[in-house]
């Protein structure tokens, strides 16, 4: 597939690397704490024009990231974190995240009023717009999978079918080239004509590349493409993450694990309330612009999923800028960072669901001078 599309897969290992402590302390601004409150000034929906204007006004130009394509997550901890968020009572407010489909699972767990997904790569924005279109057109989970991978829908799948049974029904079904062409045309039609979004030539090419990749690799698509994805995806596939990522009780948890979860995410997309943004976590604009927008409307951040982005921020000397940016977001005592790699390292919820305000205060006091220290959630 890589030869067919003329793309070069980067053979970078993706083992977690803990950057050494390069600085003795980080100068971080004090977090903006707000009282727990109803966020009734947040919009119940955004018009197409307002949604697209918001994407444009908040976004920074697309930037470089070491992983050129990031089609899926590779974090199998998502099922555990889903249930941990539910048990902790992290609920409502505004969600922020990074990366592809795993955000929908955290959104399904938290049930926020709206969400912002920030990624340095502009292609990530186009991938989320692809997801948006499919969510809006697909009535249920089986139709979502059918459209995403251009596979005819098997019979006898309904709202009561378990996600693993849905995947078992799809495995023997071959992808269909006619459906692929038709689905892609419908996606473009919905985004550009129905919604009125305008894309550059590069953005249109990115949208097609992403959809072609899901068609070409099928449900075994992983971070960089196929299983293992050229040395960086650790073999975890889209099907694994949505159907076989279990919580501590052995139950699969994802945005596709129940019809209710799917319907919630679909509803936010249908009201233009999942906003994809191109921006650098350590950059000058995106996160701060989101913070200003939320402050104006009384919004409160409930959770910020950061994956392992902090690892790269410490390597690039941008961690202090990131924490400074986060300090401009409206948070309260319940607001948390979601850090899967803390769960992998420590196995406790207090590290992996790290309270944001106390952490930022600890960072100001020099207690988070490295990625390794940040993962421990000093407070």
Regions found by a protein language model. Name each.
Residues 1-11:
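N-terminal secretory signal peptides that target proteins for export/translocation
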Residues 102-110:
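Conserved SAM-binding loop of SAM-dependent methyltransferases across substrates and taxa
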Residues 42-87, 94:
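Mature N-terminal segment immediately following signal peptide/propeptide cleavage
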Residues 13-29:
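Bacterial N-terminal signal peptides
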Residues 90-101:
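Conserved class I S-adenosyl-L-methionine
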């Amino acid at each position: 597939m890589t030869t067919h599309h003329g793309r070069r897969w980067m053979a970078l290992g993706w083992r977690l690397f803990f950057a050494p402590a390069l600085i003795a302390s980080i100068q971080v601004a004090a977090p903006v704490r707000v009282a727990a409150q109803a966020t009734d000034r947040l919009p119940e929906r955004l018009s197409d024009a307002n949604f697209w204007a918001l994407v444009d006004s908040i976004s920074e130009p697309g930037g470089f990231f070491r992983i050129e394509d990031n089609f899926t997550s590779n974090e199998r901890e998502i099922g555990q974190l889903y249930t941990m968020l539910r048990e902790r009572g992290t609920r409502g407010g505004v969600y922020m995240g990074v990366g592809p489909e795993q955000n929908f699972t955290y959104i399904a767990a938290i049930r926020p009023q709206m969400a912002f997904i920030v990624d340095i790569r502009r292609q990530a924005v186009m991938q989320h717009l692809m997801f948006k279109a499919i969510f809006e057109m697909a009535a249920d989970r089986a139709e979502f999978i059918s459209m995403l991978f251009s596979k005819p829908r098997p019979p006898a799948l309904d709202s009561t079918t378990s996600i693993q049974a849905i995947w078992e029904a799809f495995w023997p079904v071959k992808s269909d080239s006619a459906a692929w062409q038709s689905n892609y045309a419908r996606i473009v039609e919905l985004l550009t004509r129905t919604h009125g979004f305008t894309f550059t030539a590069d953005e249109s090419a990115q949208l097609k590349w992403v959809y072609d990749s899901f068609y070409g690799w099928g449900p075994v698509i992983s971070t960089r493409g196929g299983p293992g994805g050229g040395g960086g995806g650790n073999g975890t596939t889209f099907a694994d993450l949505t159907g076989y990522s279990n919580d501590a009780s052995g139950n699969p948890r994802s945005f596709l694990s129940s019809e209710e979860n799917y319907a919630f995410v679909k509803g936010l997309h249908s009201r233009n309330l999942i906003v994809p943004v191109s921006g650098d976590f350590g950059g000058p604009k995106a996160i701060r612009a989101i913070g200003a927008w939320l402050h104006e409307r009384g919004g409160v951040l409930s959770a910020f999923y950061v994956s392992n982005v902090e690892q790269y921020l410490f390597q690039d000397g941008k961690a202090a800028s990131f924490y400074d940016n986060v300090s401009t977001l409206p948070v309260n005592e319940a607001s948390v960072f979601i850090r899967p790699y803390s769960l992998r390292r420590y196995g406790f919820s207090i590290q992996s669901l790290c309270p944001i305000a106390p952490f930022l205060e600890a960072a100001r006091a020099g207690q988070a001078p490295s990625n390794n220290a940040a993962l421990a959630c000093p407070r």
